[in-house]
Every structure is written in structure tokens, then in C-alpha cells.
Curated annotation (Swiss-Prot):
Pfam families, sorted: Lentiviral_Tat
Function field: Seems to function as a Vpr-like protein, since it mediates host cell cycle arrest in G2 phase. Cell cycle arrest creates a favorable environment for maximizing viral expression and production.
GO cellular component labels: host cell nucleus; virion component
Coiled-coil boundaries: none
Name used for this protein in its record: Probable Vpr-like protein
Key words of the record: Cell cycle, Host nucleus, Virion
Keyword Cell cycle: yes
Entry-linked InterPro entries: Lentiviral_Vpr-like (IPR004247)
Compartments it resides in: Virion; Host nucleus
Primary subcellular site in the record, as a coarse category: virion
Length: 94
């Protein structure tokens, strides 16, 4: 019976994780400047939940693939520069 591959401490797995972070950041930096406002607000709201981060990046990669020559619409895609309905989630006191 075959054994499941084990994760070795300090091996290539961590290095791949670091590269994944940079790829995700580059994807977000590119797409957040080009997507329509409604989609950006939806993604910013989804990013408040850590479990949805991979889904946002996956949707962003698909959007990039479908809209290869999209023009830049804004200088920055962060929540501070683009406040919207997703921004009010943090202001609620429970």
C-alpha cells in the first residue's frame, strides 16, 4: 500500500507558498485597477472573509483571461480608495 506524501519542514512546499502569495498579489493588483466598480465592490466585500480569498483570486484570474486588453479604470483597487457597501461591514459593533 502506498504512503501519502508527507510535508517536510522547510522544503519546497514553503517556497511554493511564498511564490503563490506574490502571484496572488500581482493578479489582484492588475485586476483591481481594471474591473467594473460593481465587481470590485463585491470582491472587496468577499475579502473580509478569509475563507473566500481563494475564490476571489480564482474569479479574478478568470476575469483577466476573458478581458485580456482591459483598460485601466482607477489608480488603486484598495478599500480605502474605493469605499463601498463592502466597507461598512467593519464598522458594525456587536
Amino acid at each position: 500500500m502506498e504512503e501519502v506524501p508527507r510535508r517536510q519542514p522547510g522544503g519546497l512546499v514553503e517556497a511554493e507558498g511564498v511564490f503563490q502569495v506574490y502571484e496572488d498579489w500581482e493578479c489582484w493588483d492588475y485586476v483591481s485597477q481594471r474591473v467594473p466598480d460593481e465587481r470590485l465592490q463585491r470582491w472587496l466585500a468577499m475579502l473580509t472573509n478569509n475563507q473566500l480569498r481563494r475564490q476571489v483570486i480564482r474569479e479574478a484570474q478568470i476575469w483577466i483571461w476573458k478581458h485580456k486588453g482591459a483598460a485601466v479604470r482607477r489608480n488603486c483597487g484598495c478599500r480605502l480608495c474605493n469605499p463601498g457597501w463592502g466597507s461598512q461591514v467593519r464598522n458594525v459593533e456587536l
